[in-house]
UniProtKB/Swiss-Prot annotation:
UniProt-recorded name of the protein: DNA-directed RNA polymerase subunit beta''
Predominant place of localization: plastid
Cofactor(s) this protein cannot do without: Zn(2+)
Subunit and interaction comment: In plastids the minimal PEP RNA polymerase catalytic core is composed of four subunits: alpha, beta, beta', and beta''. When a (nuclear-encoded) sigma factor is associated with the core the holoenzyme is formed, which can initiate transcription.
Protein residues bound to Zn(2+): C220, C296, C303, C306
Gene Ontology process terms (BP): DNA-templated transcription
Assigned EC number: 2.7.7.6
Compositionally biased residues, Basic and acidic residues: 659-679, 726-737
Annotated Acidic residues bias: 680-707, 738-767
One Gene Ontology cellular component annotation held by this UniProt entry: chloroplast
Cofactor-binding details, from the entry: Binds 1 Zn(2+) ion per subunit.
């Protein structure tokens, strides 16, 4: 009893780790049998207690952590600050990503630690706590997800998802968090299914390689060893794990005393003596040489001493043990288990955090500033890097604290800075001890807005490749995206322009035609007109209907929604076109508003030639009636013929007087020629404003028209264009139809040869392609250029109908038959007209034409005029009917096929349209428009917009336009070949003006970009009284030169009149008013009259606030940024009520312009060339912040947001490009920080759109520490594949060693030693890499298991061709030991090189063909073995299993052992070889250098400590 009282009673909890230690000590003391008896009793006790306790889980047991709320709030605040820094351009995207990960990872980890203490303190008997922390079921990570927070998740590719899950499973997830969690669940399912199979297959291959490795002998007699030394950075834990269970290869001496002998196995006691000795005498410690499976001299088996102790019972491994199978299972099985582990954690992202050093108390910090170097942390924060251990003192009021910071750490505070308690002062560099995989990852940064790319001189302006757009960054610098207003669709030109924007003609690209106004009668499109003012200006309403409407209170228009979606595809070859929407009110109030507008066309670069059409509009009076199709006939002249005299008067042009029939053949031919089609190709403008998409779908679905089959252009197409049916309402023809008997009476009809054509549709143009479902361009529209305009006085419209039917459709009418209105043509088609039917069969479709009119059979054929237009007197009944002008008929020849002599005449009704030029002038354009001002001439011309005799057709609800009224520009000066035009839109508070500016000279205020495309700045103002006062920044001579070429300035929108107008003002009607410093209220004229708003006009007159490089100090009294634009005095009073305005002008002296570059150097330049301030978003700084700080800024300087240069912070980042006395203008820009080595996409000055790729970062990141990422790496190493992220390619290094070592040593020795060294080095490297994967997962695998596998992978050499051998053929794979023995047995040397084989190839290159055949490629292996006559000695396990024999392990091992007489003199032979070994060490000095210079895995215990491989001892 007394003895029992002396025992220590341990009364504490025990977890899984402590249980492992207890069992290990029990085995050491009592052996396996007694230990199992003790553990059985513990098991019984545990089950009994668990049964009586009956622990169950409830939701109340999941205790949440109280501190979670403020922890998450703190992390969110840090993330917000990080986002702000990124917006300012202080950190780049990779730093932002890293810091975001670490913020949330640190928060999650802190919560996990809090969870442990919370359970332990508040509820130690909590079932969740007991279950998970005792190791019974679950782990800390799963409980943390239940009661803490899930944190950052990884997607299926292993990449981190930026949005952390802040909730835990106890609280419940939001919808977003749930969806992100589903990624992890999916990842777990995929891993369980796929990766488990991978791990199982890996195990099978590993066992296949080493299944024949059996312990067959006690000692192989090797003299090789591997050295282990703790001096080179090996941790004590690794040192112990490496030595325990091994066998010594040499005697160990301390001084002259031997403490361990050769072939002695190392236990825990001996290891402790080694550690004690090394601690006492660290510099005198000798490396310990041990035996490993690498050093065993046997070929296909292993000896007891090279293997060491068995892992199961702690003694030397027994003979007959299948250590190969055990090794394969030991490596493969953790992969299977760890694969399943991810299913439970659900893809939660785990990262690594650096160790932080915190201040112990408040106080001032001090350190030696000479020992640190400024640097930038991984998160973009400024810091100091210390190269050696740094001593830091923190001096509080009464205590002096001293903290030692290890080398290569980051100091996060400045010297002499006051720090608070627990403040982070240093960060110990992560990676010194952590074993993480690194991988190179590309991160693409995309533009957040449209803009123009700009970079500093730090970027290589030459691209990486000759024609590429990729550039490398030599050092860290900023990229700037200068904001622009991109007009990718023309809608943007009306909706996205803000006040004080200035637009250029080049930016107006109307990619299609608009439908202006309102369509009341159409049921499909219902529009609402919103009257919006003020803040809601420029509002776009989106409806689910096909069209949309835009309104801003001043004007409105509707545009097809197809333009919004496909504006990139529209109009590739179209010039820039700018449409001004105008509403046209007819006199009748009852009729709906007719919608049409004046369209202004400005060509590319704004260059106008002579006789250019500047503007045009479509008169609704010349639109085709409602529904119907037909052809247009006219006699026309082109504009080029305008100045030629007319040969005939209008009466002679249009045929003979009424009731007069010419009979002479010459007159017939003359008349026919006048109305014959002119054979030029011009596509008809089917619809002026475009057709909604759904109409084309219907048309194509019904007829199956292919793109290339529609409108193949032929020169002789006449009367051929028709409309597809089912689109038009029937129109009654007053001529009726022919009698039925006339059809039988006449034979087959044939058209005249000149009317006959092979294909009537015309070729589609490039921009009129018809694709199913997508309207790329409005079919039939063509560039409305001067070449194709026909100026006519009268034209005729003749009804005709065309149907395009599929080839397979069955017609219900016959060719050349006469039908009536609404006759059924096919199953789903009915006719709209009555008349003669003509059918033509084409390769891909069938054309069916219906000619309306009467058929007459003349008695005398030669008296009939073919192709004539004849007026009919009987149709003139009264004046009302004559307005319709339906008093003409069109006569055509038709011939009967059966009887060549019989002819008949088809008389078709024609509608005549008269054009009166004088009527348009009063209503559309003011008369002063046609006055010659500034040598420019503008005149009105009516053009017909259809080809003669081409078929026009109505589609759906739109009306076809016959006549277009155009405004044609001309000038008298012959030396001027071109004019310049630009459009300017100005917006005031309640006023909008659009200006058209046309000038004969290049504008002096035109701005030239680097690409030399001239762009106009706006109006040039003139004042009749004193021209020198008008433009203060030009010299008098320059302005006088301008006045010689006066320009016409027209406003395109006039709200004062109820009808539309194109008003032209001379330049002298404009003036400007500037407010100066003596004005008390710069934003208003007088405080007593608050009704007067001062509009902020910057869009047009920015040049008055100082252009680029205006010398500011010279203009002392020019200060304000607000300007007022007046057109004339009447308009001024009417709109702005500025009667009380005191005209307070000061004469400003003219200045020369100068440019200030980025280095603040000034240079004068010609005022004709300036930089381009177009398409910019403006931001104004306070007026009072300029004078004091003029030296701080310069032109072109980039300023980041929130920089305190003045009294107030800069509110927006951008580039300074206009400098005034009291203010400067910043062009808004977004900075992006890019690091060294990043790749920049695009060119300098290139316009980028939102979403375009800007920069690509290449950075290293730690791989997700998930076994699903690590397991493939183990497989790749075993298969000897190249792994970029782990190290340089091992195979390449082996090739280098194979070449260099024989070259240095030379001769046969070189190959022998070179192969030995190469194999030894590669073995150590491979073991290190595999252990790194498993240790990162916390899995402990003994090195000997991996060494047995690697021994087989590296056991082959390839016979070289350098020395021919009679035994082996070049290229043959043989075992290393076999090659060495053959070399010693033969007189000649065998040359060979080391080779690295994967486990699959090794399995197929064994000594047993039965084992190979049972693994893979059975037929091939057996066939080759039969041809070679191979013999299988059945040494392995698989061969015997396949053949049903006894396997040579365990009890079956005795039958395969052949006893050899032991050589008693072996030890003395080893002693005799000592001399040889010392000589070899001198030769192999290179080996140690090779190993130590290997930079594969630094700070790794294998690379640094076990590497001195000594082949002879």
């Amino acid at each position: 009893m007394a003895e029992r009282a002396n025992l220590v009673f341990q009364n504490k909890e025990i977890d899984g780790t402590a249980m492992k230690r207890l069992i290990s000590r029990l085995i050491d003391h009592f052996g396996m049998g007694y230990t199992s008896h003790i553990l059985d009793q513990i098991k019984t006790l545990g089950f009994h207690q668990a049964t009586t306790t009956s622990i169950s889980l409830g939701i109340e047991d999941l205790l949440t952590i109280p501190s979670k709320g403020w922890l998450v709030q703190d992390a969110e605040q840090q993330s917000f600050l990080l986002e702000k820094h990124y917006y300012y351009g202080a950190v780049h995207a990779v730093e932002k990503l890293r810091q975001s990960v670490e913020i949330w990872y640190a928060t999650s980890e802190y919560l996990k630690h809090e969870m442990n203490s919370n359970f332990r303190i508040t509820d130690p008997s909590n079932p969740v706590y007991l279950m998970s922390f005792s190791g019974a079921r679950g782990n800390a990570s799963q409980v943390h997800q239940l009661v803490g927070m899930r944190g950052l998740m990884a997607d299926p590719q292993g990449q981190m998802i930026d949005l952390p899950i802040q909730s835990n499973l106890r609280e419940g997830l939001s919808l977003t968090e749930y969806i992100i969690s589903c990624y992890g669940a999916r990842k777990g399912v995929v891993d369980t299914a796929v990766r488990t199979a991978d791990a199982g297959y890996l195990t099978r291959r590993l066992v296949e390689v080493v299944q024949h490795i059996i312990v067959r002998r006690r000692d192989c007699g090797t003299i090789q060893a591997i050295s282990v030394s703790p001096q080179n950075g090996m941790t004590e834990k690794l040192f112990v794990q490496t030595l325990i269970g091994r066998v010594l290869a040499n005697d160990i001496y301390i001084g002259s005393r031997c403490i361990a002998t050769r072939n002695q196995d190392i236990g825990i006691g001996l290891v402790n003596r080694f550690i004690t000795t090394f601690r006492a005498q660290p510099f005198r410690a000798q490396p310990i040489y041990i035996r490993t499976p690498f050093t065993c001299r046997s070929t296909s088996w292993i000896c007891q001493l090279c293997y060491g102790r068995s892992s199961t019972h702690g003694d030397l491994v027994e003979l007959g043990e299948a250590v190969g199978v055990i090794a394969g299972q030991s490596i493969g099985e953790p992969g299977t288990q760890l694969t399943l582990r991810t299913f439970h954690t659900g893809g939660v992202f785990t990262g690594g955090t650096a160790d932080l050093v915190r201040s112990p108390s408040n106080g001032k910090i001090q350190f030696n500033g000479d020992l640190v170097h400024p640097t930038r942390t991984r998160h973009g924060q400024p810091a100091f890097l210390c190269y050696i251990d740094l001593h830091i003192t923190i001096q509080s009021q009464d205590i002096l604290h001293s903290v030692t910071i290890p080398s290569k750490s980051l100091i996060l505070v400045q010297n002499d800075q006051y720090v608070e308690s627990e403040q982070v002062i240093a960060e110990i560099r992560a990676g010194t001890s952590a074993l993480h995989f690194k991988e190179k990852v590309q991160k693409h940064i995309y533009s957040e807005s449209d803009g123009e790319m700009h970079w500093s001189t730090d970027v290589y302006h030459a691209p990486e490749y000759q024609y590429g757009n990729l550039r490398r960054l030599p050092k860290t610098s900023h990229l700037w995206i200068l904001s622009v207003s991109m007009c990718r669709s023309s809608i943007a030109s009306f909706s996205l322009h803000k006040d004080q924007d200035q637009m250029n003609t080049y930016s107006f690209s109307v990619d299609g035609r608009y439908i202006f106004g309102l369509s009341m009668a159409d049921d499909e499109v219902r529009h609402r007109l919103l009257d919006t003012f003020g803040k809601k200006d420029r509002e776009i309403l989106d409806y689910s209907t096909p069209d949309r409407i835009m309104s801003n209170g001043h004007w409105n228009f509707v545009y097809p929604s197809i333009l919004q979606n496909n504006f990139d595809l529209l109009a590739k070859k179209r010039r820039n076109r700018f449409a001004i929407p105008l509403q046209y009110h007819q006199e009748q109030e009852k009729e709906p508003i007719s919608c049409f507008g004046i369209s202004i066309e400005i060509p590319f670069m704004g260059v106008l030639r002579r006789n250019t059409i500047v503007a045009y509009f479509d008169d609704p009076r010349y639109k085709k009636d409602k529904k119907g199709s037909g052809i247009v006939k006219f006699r026309y002249r082109t504009l080029e013929d305008e100045y030629r005299t007319r040969e005939k008067d209008s009466e002679n042009e249009y045929g003979s007087p009424e009731n007069e029939y010419r009979t002479r053949e010459e007159e017939c031919k003359t008349l026919e020629d006048e109305y014959r089609t002119r054979e030029e190709e011009y596509e008809t403008l089917e619809d002026e404003y475009g057709i909604p998409e759904n109409e084309y779908e219907t048309l194509e679905d019904e007829y199956g028209i292919l793109e290339d089959e529609y409108r193949t252009r032929e020169e002789e197409s006449e009367d051929e264009y028709g409309s597809p049916e089912n689109k038009y309402r029937p129109r009654e023809d007053k001529y009726g139809t022919l009698e039925e008997d006339s059809e039988d009476e006449h034979g087959t009809l044939e058209e005249d040869s000149e009317e006959d054509s092979e294909d009537e549709y015309g070729n589609p143009e490039e921009d009129s392609v018809l694709k199913k479902g997508v309207l790329i361009e409005h079919r039939g529209t063509k560039e409305f250029s001067l070449k194709y305009q026909k100026e006519v006085d009268r034209f005729f419209f003749i009804l005709q109908e065309l149907h395009i039917l599929p080839r397979s459709s069955s017609l219900k009418v016959l060719d050349n038959s006469i039908i009536g209105v609404d006759t059924q043509l096919t199953k789903n088609t009915r006719s709209r007209l009555g008349g003669l039917v003509r059918v033509k069969r084409k390769k891909s479709h069938t054309e069916l034409k219906i000619f309306s009119g009467d058929i007459h059979f003349p008695e005398e054929a030669d008296k009939i005029l073919g192709g004539s237009l004849i007026p009919l007197e009987r149709e003139k009944k009264d004046s009302k009917e004559s307005k319709k002008r339906e008093n003409w008929v069109y006569v055509q020849w038709k011939k009967i096929l059966k009887s060549k002599e019989k002819y008949f005449v088809l008389v078709r009704p024609a509608v005549a349209y008269e054009m009166n030029e004088g009527r348009n002038l009063a209503t559309l354009f003011p008369q002063d428009l046609l006055q010659e001002e500034g040598n420019l001439q503008l005149r009105l011309v009516n053009f017909i917009s259809h080809e003669n005799s081409k078929l026009t057709q109505r589609i759906y609800h739109t009306n076809s336009q016959f006549v277009r009224t155009c405004l044609v520009l001309n000038w008298e000066q012959e030396e001027k070949e071109e004019a310049r035009a630009s459009l300017v839109e100005i917006r005031a508070n309640g006023l909008i003006r659009d200006f058209l500016r046309i000038g004969l000279i290049k504008s002096t205020i035109s701005y030239t970009r680097k690409r030399y495309d001239s762009r106009s700045a706006g109006l040039i103002l003139h004042n009749r009284l004193d021209r020198t006062n008008t433009n203060s920044f030009y010299s008098k001579a320059k302005i006088q030169s301008l006045s010689q070429h006066q320009e016409a300035i027209g406003t395109l929108l006039n709200r004062n009149k109820e009808y539309q107008s194109l008003m032209v003002l001379s330049a002298s009607n404009c003036s400007r008013i500037g407010f100066f410093k003596n004005s008390k209220n710069p934003n208003g004229v007088k405080e007593s009259n608050p009704r007067i708003p001062i509009p902020k006009f910057w869009g047009l007159f920015r040049n008055f606030s100082g252009l680029l490089g205006t010398i500011a100090p010279s203009i002392s009294n020019f200060s304000s940024s607000y300007y007022l634009l007046t057109y004339n005095q009447i308009l001024l009073k009417k709109h702005l009520l500025l009667d009380n305005l005191k005209q307070n002008f000061k004469v400003l002296q003219g200045l020369k312009h100068s440019l200030i570059n980025e280095n603040q150097r000034t240079s004068n330049f010609d005022s004709n060339i300036m930089l381009d301030p177009f398409q910019l978003n403006w931001h104004f700084l306070p007026h009072d912040s300029w004078e004091e700080t003029s030296a701080k800024i310069h032109l072109g300087q980039f300023i980041c947001e929130n920089v305190c240069l003045f009294k107030s912070h800069i509110k927006k980042s951008g580039q300074i490009f206009i400098v005034n006395i009291d203010s400067f203008v910043i062009r808004a820009a977004k900075p992006y920080l890019a690091t060294t080595g990043a790749t920049v996409h695009g060119h300098y000055g290139e316009i980028l759109y939102k979403g375009d790729r800007l920069v690509t970062f290449i950075y290293e990141k730690a791989r997700s520490s998930d076994i699903t990422q690590g397991l493939p790496k183990v497989e790749q190493i075993f298969e000897a594949r190249s792994i970029d992220s782990l190290s340089p390619n091992l195979e390449r290094r082996i090739e280098d060693w194979n070449e260099r070592i024989p070259r240095i040593l030379g001769g046969p020795w070189g190959f022998l030693i070179g192969a030995e060294l190469t194999i030894a080095q590669s073995r150590i490297s491979l073991v290190n890499k595999i252990q790194k994967v498993y240790r990162s997962q916390g899995v402990q695998i003994h090195n000997r298991h991996i060494e047995i596998i690697i021994r087989q992978v590296t056991s082959k050499v390839r016979v070289s061709e350098d020395g021919m051998s009679n035994v082996f053929s070049p290229g043959e794979l043989i075992g290393l030991l076999r090659a060495e023995r053959a070399g010693r047995a033969l007189d000649e040397s065998i040359y060979y090189r080391a080779i690295l084989l994967g486990i699959t190839r090794v399995s197929l290159n064994t000594q047993s063909f039965i084992s190979e055949a049972s693994f893979q490629e059975t037929a091939r292996v057996l066939a080759k073995a039969a041809l070679r006559g191979r013999i299988d000695w059945l040494k392995g396990l698989k061969e015997n299993v396949v053949l049903g024999g006894i396997i040579p392990v365990g009890t079956g091992f005795q039958k395969f052992v052949h006893r050899y007489p032991q050589n008693k003199n072996l030890y003395f032979e080893i002693q005799k070889k000592k001399l040889f070994a010392s000589e070899m060490r001198d030769i192999l000095f290179l080996h140690t250098e090779l190993v130590s210079s290997d930079s594969d895995v630094t700070n790794n215990f294998y690379e640094t400590s076990e590497s001195p491989f000594t082949p002879f001892i």
